[in-house]
């Protein structure tokens, strides 16, 4: 997505949420300065735009944001050999790994979307993404069918056994043997949610958070406008711009037009045939928007349309020929 200015061209389409949070409006300070922070995380960039309350320590808050993101990388990155995720991936058959709250929340959401999407989203494809060179390792050639079959046999969300947290007991995840997690289809969305939550707990009710293109809008700008973002359109495709008011709302994108993107259908182990070139999903949770955008981008576009409509998702799909489909939930926001 692209962070947009407040001015609205005549040809643009506008999508707005159904409700305005009256509490957020009541806490609005028209004199608050808008401050931008940014940094690096998860192999990409993060950016925060905040309406900074009087007396706030901007440097300390920015440091807290970076520390929060660094903590999630230490838990869930498949690029960091010392991360908890990598330790789980190489754990012994039948062993249980205790999950911190962030990791547990991501796994629970990932398993929910995996089930609801009939496996179109799968957090347990690390073996498959590895043989395709979508992780730290860079194979010299694409995998052959036998290699893909072996990776698929060692993968799959249905092999995961999650023991959820109870009173005074951490959640834990069983290693079924040789299974590798890859949370890249959901982690950036969760990170954006986590930063927005950190800011809210610090008394910042109005902020726009972006992590690698996944965005959360909390509250609104000091001038009373929402946080505007424009949904991206792949190069060479001409469509009327679609601008979204991110007020207590998040947006995530997926597609092969994104730099470095390479989507796999978890059910076949191959690049999906007939999938959308670009997918955008709006949701109150950026983590859920991220996971659903990943799911919709991994299947043929007709299946993605049916899935988005069935789940009531506010989604836009763009076909490779330039055709556009807006889900009923997104159309209702225009």
Language model feature labels by segment:
Residues 1-334:
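Mature catalytic core of soluble alpha/beta enzymes
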């Amino acid at each position: 997505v692209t962070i947009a200015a407040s001015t609205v061209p005549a040809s643009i389409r506008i999508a707005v949420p159904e409700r305005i949070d009256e509490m957020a409006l009541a806490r609005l300070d028209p004199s608050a300065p808008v401050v931008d922070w940014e940094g690096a995380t998860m192999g990409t960039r993060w950016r925060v735009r905040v309406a900074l309350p009087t007396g706030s320590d901007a440097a300390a808050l920015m440091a807290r944001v970076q520390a929060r993101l660094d903590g999630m990388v230490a838990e869930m990155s498949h690029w960091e050999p010392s991360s908890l995720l990598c330790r789980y991936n190489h754990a012994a058959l039948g062993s249980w790994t205790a999950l911190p709250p962030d990791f547990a929340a991501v796994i629970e959401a990932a398993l929910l979307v995996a089930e609801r999407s009939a496996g179109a989203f799968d957090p347990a494809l690390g073996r498959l993404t590895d043989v395709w060179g979508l992780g730290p390792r860079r194979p010299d050639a694409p995998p052959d069918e036998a290699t893909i079959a072996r990776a698929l046999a060692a993968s799959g969300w249905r092999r995961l056994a999650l023991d959820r947290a109870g009173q005074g007991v951490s959640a834990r995840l069983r290693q079924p043997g040789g299974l590798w997690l890859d949370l890249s289809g959901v982690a950036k969305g969760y990170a954006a949610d986590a930063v927005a939550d950190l800011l809210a707990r610090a008394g910042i009710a109005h902020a726009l958070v972006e992590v690698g293109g996944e965005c959360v809008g909390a509250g609104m700008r000091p001038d009373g406008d929402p946080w505007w973002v424009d949904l991206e359109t792949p190069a060479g495709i001409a469509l009327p711009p679609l601008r979204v008011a991110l007020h207590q709302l998040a947006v995530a994108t997926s597609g092969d037009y994104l730099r470095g993107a390479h989507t796999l259908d978890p059910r076949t182990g191959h690049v999906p045939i007939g999938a959308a070139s670009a997918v955008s999903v709006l949701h109150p949770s950026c983590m859920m928007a991220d996971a659903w955008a990943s799911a919709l981008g991994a299947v043929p576009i007709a299946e993605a349309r049916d899935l988005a409509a069935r789940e009531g998702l506010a989604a836009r799909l763009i076909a490779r020929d330039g055709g556009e489909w807006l889900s009923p939930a997104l159309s209702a926001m225009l």
